[in-house]
Amino acid sequence: LGTSVRMIGETLFSAAEDADVYVSMARHKRTLELLKAKEDNGALVINSAYGVERCERSLLDVALREQGIPVPNSEGSDGYWLKRGDMSAQHKGDVVYCKDRAELTEQQASFVLRGITNWIVQAHVPGDLVKFYAVQSGFFRYFYPNDDGISKFGDEEMNGKAQHYGFDVAGLQATAETIAMLTGVEVYGGDAIITASGAFYIIDFNDWPSFSRCRDEA
């Protein structure tokens, strides 16, 4: 990145900042607008602020379904996941499991009381939960969070102990790369469910995941 690297908090970033390359984990709308202006003026921003906006969950859900990417249906018999649609989960209550339609309706009402009217609904898919981390250059790793116990909000427990079902790893990587191209991000990660039959479903995708399990390697 050169000989001079400066770190700055997202809320302190301003139009006066000047650099050739911006490595950004920003999510605030104001900051993204500033970064888009930097991109428009020729600066390299990783991840692109335009790409980060396209990772908004409700927008991405529509795009993935239109492109035929394997994602859970909105109807199912094993419960539902209600997910805040305007951003990635920042709080435990932003992604909620509902055992049936009645509970889903209750949780949607709870979202409205919190001022949240943008959401998506995904049917729960039984199977192994895997988390993947990737960089556009070809780096791709996946892990079973229920093997190491590392969890952000504990929702991983809903899928139980990993059975390590066989699946097409190259296919998962190719699908993740397709989503990265659709959104325009270079550093990304997400979650997928692997069913007993070996099928996989993308249940989450985001820019700049934690890389907690492979940070040094990445």
Predicted regions and their residues:
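Anionic group-transfer/hydrolysis microenvironments
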Residues: 27, 85, 124-125, 133, ...
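Conserved metal-phosphate-binding beta-hairpin within the catalytic cores
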Residues: 180-215
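Short glycine-/acidic-enriched loop or helix-start segments at secondary-structure transitions
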Residues: 32-35, 57, 91-93, 131, ...
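A short linear hydrophobic-aromatic micro-motif
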Residues: 81, 118-121, 187-190
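Catalytic phosphate/metal-binding cores of nucleic-acid and nucleotide-processing enzymes, i.e., regions
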Residues: 218
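Phosphate-binding site of ATP-dependent enzymes
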Residues: 98-183
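Conserved anion/nucleotide-ligand pocket segment
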Residues: 80-103
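Conserved N-proximal alpha/beta basic substrate-recognition cap immediately N-terminal to
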Residues: 1-75, 87-88
